[in-house]
Each structure stands twice: as C-alpha cells, then as structure tokens.
Amino acid sequence: MRPNKTSLLLALLSILSQANAYEYVNCFSSLPSDFSKADSYNWQSSSHCNSECSAKGASYFALYNHSECYCGDTNPSGSESTSSSCNTYCFGYSSEMCGGEDAYSVYQLDSDTNSNSISSSDSSTESTSASSSTTSSTTSSTTSTTSSTTSSTTSSMASSSTVQNSPESTQAAASISTSQSSSTVTSESSLTSDTLATSSTSSQSQDATSIIYSTTFHTEGGSTIFVTNTITASAQNSGSATGTAGSDSTSGSKTHKKKANVGAIVGGVVGGVVGAVAIALCILLIVRHINMKREQDRMEKEYQEAIKPVEYPDKLYASSFSSNHGPSSGSFEEEHTKGQTDINPFDDSRRISNGTFINGGPGGKNNVLTVVNPDEAD
C-alpha cells in the first residue's frame, strides 16, 4: 500500500515544527539566576543562540556583548530592570544587536515549538486524482498561536522556511513583508516529491531578526491547498534558501575579514622592512661622518707638528770665544780637555777660517787668508 498523503503531511509538519521560532522580549541590565551561559561564538546571532537554547529545552535566551549566549526558563520582565544599553552588534549578523557591555537582549522561544508536541495519526484518506472522492480525516494539529481550521485536516505552524507560488519553488523573505500564497497538490507522487524538497530547505535560512511564518493547508475535493503567511522584520539573504545559521550565513564577511587581515599583515611587514632600511642608512651616514671628522683632526694635528719651529735655548749654545774668554788656540788637547758641549753652528759670535784658496802661488809662496770678526777686538 502506498503512503497516505495525510501521513506524509503530518510528517512534514513534525519536521518543520522543529524549526526555531522566537520573539524579542526586551533589553535588561541583568538576568535571573537560572540563566546559564550556553556558549561564546565568534559568529554569534540570535538564530545561533536560539538553536543552542532550543536544544537544551530552555524557554528564553539572551545575547550579551557581541558573542555570548545565555539560556534560562524565567522571564526577566517580572524581576529585572530594563535597560537602553543594548547597542553592541552581533558578530555573526551586524544588523542585529547582541546586548551590550552591561546589558542583555532577551528573546522568548515559542513554547509549542520547543515542546515539539505534534500529534500524528494514520489517516485513511487517499486521493489519486482531483476528481476522485476523498474521505476526510479528523486529525488536527496546532503548533503556533496563530491557527485556523479551514477543512477537516488543518495544521498551523511557525518555522523558518516558506513555500510560495508553487510546490516546486522555495525562497527566503528578504524585507519587511507579508505574503500569502497557495498551492494545490493533485497527485500523490507530486505530494511526495514536494514534501521532500520542502523538508530539505526547511532547516535553512535562519538569519532573520524576527520572523514569524504561519502555514496552513486543507484538503478539498481530492486536492491539498497550502496557504502561507509570512511576516518578516528583516533578513540577510533573498532568493533560494541557501544560508544556514552560524558560520555559513556569514562566510562572506568572514572572507572579507580574512582578506583585510592579510592586507594589514603585508602592509606591516613592508613598512617594517622600509623602516629598518632607513634606520640602517642613517646609522651608516652618522658613522661615516664621525670617521671623516676624526681623519681630518688627525691630519691637521700632523700638519701642525710638521710646521712647528724648533727652539734652541741660548744657554746651551754659547760661542767658543765667549766660553773661553779669548781666542782658541785650536789645539786638539784643548778641545777635548774642556769637555764636549752642544754648539749651535749658526749661533757663534766669531768665525775663524784658516786656509788658502790657492795652494801654490806664482812665486811659490802660500798666502794665508785670515778672517776675523771685526766686531770683536784682538
């Protein structure tokens, strides 16, 4: 026996009912004592924190200081004071506020969604074509506060996926809008394939700030009609539902930050190398200038030493006449018996030269030339 359409629809509702629905409560300066920290996530958003706290069965969750998530079961409105300091954006979704440095953004999870209480029962309804007769089922399931009964089989739900225009197309809302669409399933094979497609996309596209979806369906005359109401405050992506909560929905911004970090690192390395080269050149020029200055001083000192005049004290160079108080006989014994004294050859008051210019004269006599200092008397 082929699967019953109503059973497949109820299975679809049980899957979609696990999607996360939540409402913003308020901004508070503190939390009740039963709130505990769930995680601290680098790409934090309300959708991610909602998923964490839904898995723990909590009734409320709170976002704090960009990236921290807290879960609890007590409504802070009854015991905690409100605050206006929820002004820090979420790291995972910059258009959304994740509390503040001393404030908490508190959200309430949908209680029916959290309990996952969807009753399902087998139905004997089976339709093979639009013209065939249908035995209605009396099964009724309600999973949200907004529900309506339009036929014998009715279900209302809150989730994060939307079926619009036709069973073959699904898309996520991207602006503040309210949309309503309907679709008709006329064959069992079409219902099965569309249910699987919807189930595969129902767990995606959870990046909205505040999203409420209400989907109802009913069977009439062998046909199944879907009616979807969507109320969206804001959303990140439009088109087909391809984004997922957490790191996948923010992969673009993560890549951009990585590129920015690489550029900053490269710029820092280049700047450091240029600065090091400039400092090395300055040190080299300073050392060269000091060496040139020292060389100039050394050469100047050597030059001054070279041109410095030699001084001879007068007492060391007295003339032979003054020291002997008379003319010297010029004997060898007299010169050596009186001792050796330093004599300045250019400071002698008397010069005597004995000798001849011509050893032999015409007459055969040697003439003696005697030169006497005329300033001294004999």
UniProtKB/Swiss-Prot annotation:
Q: How is it modified after translation?
A: Glycosylated. Phosphorylated. Phosphorylation serves a negative regulatory role.
Q: Which residues lie on this side of the membrane: Cytoplasmic?
A: 286-378
The stretches that face the Extracellular side, renumbered to this chain, are 22-264
Which keywords accompany this UniProt record?
Answer: Cell cycle, Cell membrane, Cell wall biogenesis/degradation, Glycoprotein, Membrane, Phosphoprotein, Signal, Stress response, Transmembrane, Transmembrane helix
- What residues form the membrane-spanning segments? 265-285
Record SMART domains: WSC (SM00321)
Does this entry carry the keyword Phosphoprotein?
yes
Membrane-protein topology: Single-pass type I membrane protein
Record-linked InterPro entries: Kremen_rcpt, WSC_carb-bd
- Briefly explain the null phenotype: Lack of SLG1 leads to a significant defect of 1,3-beta-glucan synthesis and confers sensitivity to caffeine, SDS, Calcofluor and alkaline pH stress. Deletion of residues 21-256 results in non-functional protein, removal of residues 21-110 yields a protein still able to confer some tolerance to alkaline stress, and deletion of residues 116-256 has no effect on the function.
Record field: compositional bias (Low complexity): 236-253, 319-331
Please report the stretch or stretches of sequence annotated as the WSC domain: 22-110
The positions flagged as glycosylation sites are N65
Cell compartments where the protein resides: Cell membrane
Q: Which GO terms describe its biological process?
A: actin cytoskeleton organization; endocytosis; establishment of cell polarity; fungal-type cell wall organization; pexophagy; positive regulation of endocytosis; response to heat; response to osmotic stress
Further comment found in the protein's record? Present with 664 molecules/cell in log phase SD medium.
What does the record give as the function of this protein? Plays a role during G1 to regulate entering or exiting the cell cycle. Involved in stress responses. Has a role in cell wall integrity signaling. Activates ROM1 or ROM2 catalyzed guanine nucleotide exchange toward RHO1. Important regulator of the actin cytoskeleton rearrangements in conditions of cell wall expansion and membrane stretching. Specifically required for the actin reorganization induced by hypo-osmotic shock. Multicopy suppressor of 1,3-beta-glucan synthase (GS). Activates GS upstream of RHO1. Acts positively on the PKC1-MAPK pathway.
Name it.
Protein SLG1
